[in-house]
């Protein structure tokens, strides 16, 4: 008999994280593999004049122009459990999905649920709590959860289709950063490291609360930031880590991104866990996918390197803006409760790479 009972709760309900091989945005297909898969399509590219944002720059959402003042923002995001509490899982997944709309400078209008559950394994009241958590976030965002689709799945999967609206003149892409822009990160890093610690039963209550609080905070500032003329580009930092999404900014603008590792905000307890070698498998896959396009200072420790590739679930907005609006950007974050938003680097002329010092 297997004496390991760590995956079984007192009421014999399996831990959600024990039912999946990955969790949160760490479930993403590695960026290098994804690029290879997408490149295999033999279908000719089609041009749609009103499709303002498609797949070209790996942006956060698709944007389709309705008229000169309105465009639809459409996105979808789902994943397997990053935590064991079903209500928290639903909240985190929903917050993460809606983030893509805010990252385009949009305002959410409604959502549809994507549900895949092992119906004969998980009690139905547990599944109901996941759905309730997702709906609670939609209510917080002021939108209806208007429907969805469900399947019987081997692993638990939950997420949303998000539909939003944006003024095309205020829409922010991830490809429009300018030489000399300042980079600002809206949330602290380390979600992947904390989630890895949780799976190993090494995360204390304070660390868990910090992780859940960060991942259930809606990236609402994106809507207001898009109205600032000096904000050139927006994206959110998710499964490909800070380096991966920073590289997307660099490639889109054909510039270099320079990041100061000493200025990176991180969640409580992350530093100590990283120094113990706690990190996700996705962190290594991320580095394998884009490491050749990154230059790291030789002084960086392994723990610092792990933080840079750490997959973020419902991570912070990454803003590229002019120096003269930095104070305004930080104030928008502060007014929405993002006290740890910080200047972390800049964009500069050069090859599309990321430099970390």
UniProtKB/Swiss-Prot annotation:
Entry-linked SUPFAM superfamilies: PurM C-terminal domain-like (SSF56042), PurM N-terminal domain-like (SSF55326)
Database matches in PANTHER family: INACTIVE SELENIDE, WATER DIKINASE-LIKE PROTEIN-RELATED (PTHR10256:SF0), SELENIDE, WATER DIKINASE (PTHR10256)
Enzyme active site: 25
UniProt: ATP binding residues: 28, 57-59, 77, 100, 148-150
Catalytic activity entry: hydrogenselenide + ATP + H2O = selenophosphate + AMP + phosphate + 2 H(+)
CC terms in the record's Gene Ontology section: cytoplasm
A Pfam family hit: AIRS
Gene: selD
GO MF entry, a single one: selenide, water dikinase activity
Residues of the site described as Important for catalytic activity: 28
Keyword Transferase: yes
Annotated HAMAP family: SelD (MF_00625)
Protein name per Swiss-Prot or TrEMBL: Selenide, water dikinase
GO biological process, one term: selenocysteine biosynthetic process
Summary of subunit composition and partner proteins: Homodimer.
Family: Belongs to the selenophosphate synthase 1 family. Class I subfamily.
Enzyme Commission numbers on file: 2.7.9.3
InterPro entries, A to Z: PurM-like_C_dom, PurM-like_C_sf, PurM-like_N, PurM-like_N_sf, SelD_I, SPS/SelD
Keywords: ATP-binding, Kinase, Magnesium, Metal-binding, Nucleotide-binding, Selenium, Transferase
Record function comment: Synthesizes selenophosphate from selenide and ATP.
Cofactor(s) recorded in Swiss-Prot or TrEMBL: Mg(2+)
């Amino acid at each position: 008999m297997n004496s390991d009972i760590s995956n079984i709760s007192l009421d014999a309900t399996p831990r959600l994280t024990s039912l999946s091989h990955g969790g949160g945005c760490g479930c993403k297909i590695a960026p290098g593999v994804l690029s290879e898969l997408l490149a295999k399509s033999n279908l000719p590219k089609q041009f749609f004049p009103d499709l303002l944002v498609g797949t070209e720059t790996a942006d956060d959402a698709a944007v389709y122009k309705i008229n000169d003042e309105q465009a639809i923002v459409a996105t979808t995001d789902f994943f397997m459990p990053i935590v064991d509490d079903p209500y928290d899982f639903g909240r985190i997944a929903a917050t993460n999905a809606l983030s893509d709309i805010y990252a385009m400078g949009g305002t959410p209008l409604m959502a549809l649920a994507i549900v895949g559950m092992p119906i004969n394994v998980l009690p139905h009241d547990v599944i109901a709590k996941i759905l309730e958590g997702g709906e609670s976030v939609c209510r917080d965002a002021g939108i209806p959860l208007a429907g969805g689709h469900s399947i019987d799945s081997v692993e638990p999967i939950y997420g949303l289709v998000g539909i939003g609206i944006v003024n095309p003149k205020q829409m922010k892409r991830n490809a429009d950063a300018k030489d000399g822009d300042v980079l600002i990160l809206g949330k602290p890093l380390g979600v992947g490291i904390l989630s890895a610690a949780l799976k190993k039963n090494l995360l204390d209550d304070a660390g868990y609360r910090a992780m859940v609080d960060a991942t259930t905070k809606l990236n609402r500032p994106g809507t207001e930031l898009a109205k600032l003329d000096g904000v050139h580009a927006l994206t959110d930092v998710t499964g490909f880590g800070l380096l991966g999404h920073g590289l997307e900014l660099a490639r889109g603008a054909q510039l270099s991104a320079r990041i100061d590792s000493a200025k990176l905000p991180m969640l409580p307890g992350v530093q100590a866990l990283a120094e113990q070698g706690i990190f996700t498998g996705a962190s290594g896959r991320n580095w394998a996918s884009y490491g050749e396009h990154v230059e790291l200072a030789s002084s960086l420790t392994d723990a610092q390197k792990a933080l840079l590739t750490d997959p973020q679930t419902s991570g912070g907005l990454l803003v590229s803006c002019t120096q003269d609006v930095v104070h305004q950007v930080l104030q928008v974050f502060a007014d929405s409760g993002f006290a740890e938003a910080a200047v972390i680097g800049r964009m500069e002329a050069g090859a599309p790479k990321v430099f970390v010092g």
